[in-house]
């Protein structure tokens, strides 16, 4: 099968990872995969086995299936000659839906169960099951690494996107200092042409907190593996990559429902809290003070991540294409 995928860039974003990982899986299964984006350069942060070409090349090519997930490349995606056009919704409030919904020549897909159901109600037509996404062979526990670090809380540091809830989490953590066992906070983010805001500028950091800027894939994995707790307070997310990566790596996860409903089960493999300081504080306090709870949540995480692997998702999408 000839599969064409469209992205606005290949920077360090969860939506970009989705297309790179799926492309790798489809190539491994013998399919011909081409990624179109404006600059046409290969991603530098994650190996990619498909073909990468400039967006303008799509006009002279054909495919069996074309997949797009953003409004910026939508026009080129629709003009591209393909047997089927699929718009893959990966975030709530996706601006691309303004064009995709009334376009009945486009098949819709979504990356979470909640988003899929919401989109089906709004569109009045079927939505492909594009739910899932994790590389469990990479994101996996390494108990020895965690045992060698002090009590550590890991947080997605992307403050340029308020919906990630980074500052909310930092304020909650600051309020817990001195009221729970001593802990350190580590935040991660990248700063590049696609995410220019330095998250360290004006960050309301609690004591003993630090940023790791631009971690490699291996360094990011090590951060998950060495952290005891991961906190995500997102809103309007499609699929919370970081929460699932933490879960798969054996962290005790505290999260909101946004982007986690498919895999986070309250009191089983995570503590799921309302996105409010009171409820987040209560949940984080529990995992920081109760070592047995931390261990129980951490132990349940890796197995619960397995059904959502990229290989499973790639096969599922191929069956629907």
Annotate each PLM feature.
Residues 4, 109, 145-164, 170-174:
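Conserved donor-binding/catalytic core segment of Leloir-type glycosyltransferases
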Residues 235:
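Aromatic "clamp/platform" in nucleotide-sugar-dependent glycosyltransferases that forms part
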Residues 222-227:
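Short alpha-helical donor nucleotide-sugar binding micro-motif in glycosyltransferases
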């Amino acid at each position: 099968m000839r599969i064409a995928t469209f992205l606005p860039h290949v920077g360090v974003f969860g939506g970009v990872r989705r297309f790179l990982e799926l492309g790798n899986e489809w190539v491994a299964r013998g399919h011909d995969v081409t990624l179109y984006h404006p600059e046409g350069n290969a991603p530098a942060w994650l190996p990619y086995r498909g073909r990468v070409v400039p967006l303008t090349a799509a006009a002279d090519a054909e495919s069996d299936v074309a997949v797009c997930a953003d409004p910026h490349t939508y026009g080129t995606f629709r003009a591209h000659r393909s047997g089927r056009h699929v718009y893959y919704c990966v975030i709530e409030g996706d601006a691309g839906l303004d064009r995709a919904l009334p376009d009945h020549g486009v098949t819709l897909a979504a990356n979470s169960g909640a988003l899929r159901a919401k989109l089906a109600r709004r569109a009045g037509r079927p939505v492909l099951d594009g739910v899932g996404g994790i590389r469990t062979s990479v994101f996996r526990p390494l108990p020895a690494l965690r045992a060698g670090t002090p009590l550590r809380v890991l947080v997605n540091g992307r403050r340029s996107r308020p919906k990630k809830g980074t500052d909310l989490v930092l304020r909650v953590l600051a309020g817990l200092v001195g009221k729970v066992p001593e802990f350190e906070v580590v935040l991660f983010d990248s700063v590049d042409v696609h995410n220019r805001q330095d998250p360290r500028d004006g960050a309301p950091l609690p004591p003993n907190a630090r940023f790791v800027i631009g971690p490699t894939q291996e360094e990011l994995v090590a951060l998950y593996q060495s952290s005891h707790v991961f906190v995500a307070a997102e809103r309007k997310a499609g699929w919370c990559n970081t929460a699932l990566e933490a879960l798969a790596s054996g962290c005790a996860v505290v999260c909101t429902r946004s982007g986690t409903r498919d895999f986070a089960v309250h009191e089983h493999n995570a503590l799921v809290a309302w996105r409010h300081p009171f409820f987040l504080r209560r949940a984080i306090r529990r995992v920081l003070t109760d070592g047995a709870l931390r261990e129980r949540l951490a132990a349940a995480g890796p197995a619960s991540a397995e059904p959502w692997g990229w290989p499973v998702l790639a096969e599922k999408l191929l069956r629907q294409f």
